[in-house]
């Protein structure tokens, strides 16, 4: 059974500088499907991705070999620099190199960010899609 974790919703959003509807990410871990689904909203920064990765590592059902679908379609802005991409790939990423990863994008900027992550990972098992259904089908193969 999948468990949905909404980051920061338990905290007072205004105390963290967020409006109540501006939660940076929510994720669910489905151990039966061996899959993690993360939805980023508002803006994506290296700090928000690191926070997601830390929460995910602490989840008792998470395994680094699970597949992942990263849904970027609701993000308004991606604030990542070249050194952020390197840090994400080398230090923050909680998944093993063998894990299948799918990015679901809506804009060219989201597509470029996903492509950068794919380039920096040692194995080329990251794909980019425009629909959630295509991404899920590919990850589950």
Task: Pin down the residues of each PLM region.
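Amphipathic, Lys/Arg-enriched alpha-helical "gate/interface" segment within cytosolic domains
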Residues: 2-141
């Amino acid at each position: 059974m999948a468990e949905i974790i909404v980051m920061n919703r338990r905290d007072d959003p205004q105390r963290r500088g967020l409006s109540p509807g501006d939660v940076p990410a929510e994720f669910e871990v489905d151990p039966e499907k061996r899959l993690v689904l993360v939805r980023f909203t508002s803006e994506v920064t290296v700090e928000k991705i690191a926070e997601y990765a830390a929460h995910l590592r602490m989840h008792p059902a998470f395994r680094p070999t699970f597949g992942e679908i990263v849904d970027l379609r609701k993000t308004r802005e991606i604030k990542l620099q070249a050194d952020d991409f390197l840090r994400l790939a080398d230090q923050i990423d909680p998944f093993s190199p063998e894990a299948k990863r799918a990015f679901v994008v809506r804009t060219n900027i989201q597509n470029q960010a996903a492509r950068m992550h794919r380039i920096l990972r040692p194995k080329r098992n990251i794909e980019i899609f425009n629909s959630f259904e295509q991404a899920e089908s590919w990850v589950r193969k």
